[in-house]
Amino acid sequence: LPGLEPDWTRIWTYKEAMVPPSLPTSLLVIGSGAIGIEFASFYRALGVAVTVVEVQNRILPVEDEEISKLAHKAFAKQGITIHTGATVKQLSHTQDGGVMARLRTANGNTAEIAVDRVIMAVGITGNVEQLGLEQHGVTVDKGHIVVDEWCRTGATGVYAIGDVVGPPWLAHKAMQEGVLCVEKIAGLEGVHPLDPRSVPGCTYCTPQIASLGLTEAVAREAGYELKVGRYPYSANGKAIALGETDGLIKTIFDAKTGALLGAHMIGAEVTELIQGFAIGKTLETTEAELMATIFPHPTLSEMMHESVLDAFGRALHI
């Protein structure tokens, strides 16, 4: 961002934030996507005073709005200061070795925040500049290489995977792209293209956040008639035994077909739980099959079952 370039000593990218020479006493995180929230949660757990600034009207803007609101509440309870609808207009070095940030707040006012360090967490892009890609028939659009469902570029024999082809910027998505790309080149039978709607996204903060498929808002905008189920951690025996009663499992179904459109979670170990719904969505499992599936007791996974049941008015334990 113009005027907000990292200097790698006081104003960090995610790389410097991974290996700080010393622990700052205060930190400003610009951006509240997965990277920003993970660092905010991590540094707050170490006792750092953390402030998060997000230009959108809520943190974790790509997540389901209900999950985003619960996350905001949880982080605020931990002592993280959050400014949404705000923009960082200027960063300047201070004589004490810190940084002064000038913000435009949601109500249009100007505010200043003095911190030890700043993390720029406004997103990542692959390195595609000045490689001469266009000269060889590879199309680059808005910083990303354009590929088809098999990761083929516009140049014969040239494939691209991972961050350079655009979101979601996830290691497991890039790995699967690499596998299907090589299998397609090798001529293996039964190779399936990657469906981005079946790629689980995980944010490793406290509480954890995980999601899959469409959010409720996006599904409604797409014209689906929905069945939405919810189940709280506070009603699950395993969560109570673990002392982890803050959280929610939310499932979204097509009311006409019973297809699982999305699953959204916040709470302990949801980054492990989400894979169950990823398998179900990949196999095109319906609500009837999920409701008929036996989930072991006592486990956190029972909340997944209860959320599905709740979507169709059949929840058992709430």
List where the protein language model places each region.
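Rossmann-like NAD(P)H-binding beta-loop-alpha module
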Residues: 10, 21-63, 96, 170
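A Rossmann-like FAD-binding core segment of flavoenzymes
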Residues: 13, 46-149, 214, 221
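A short, glycine/Asx- and small/polar-enriched loop/turn
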Residues: 93-99, 155-156, 242-247
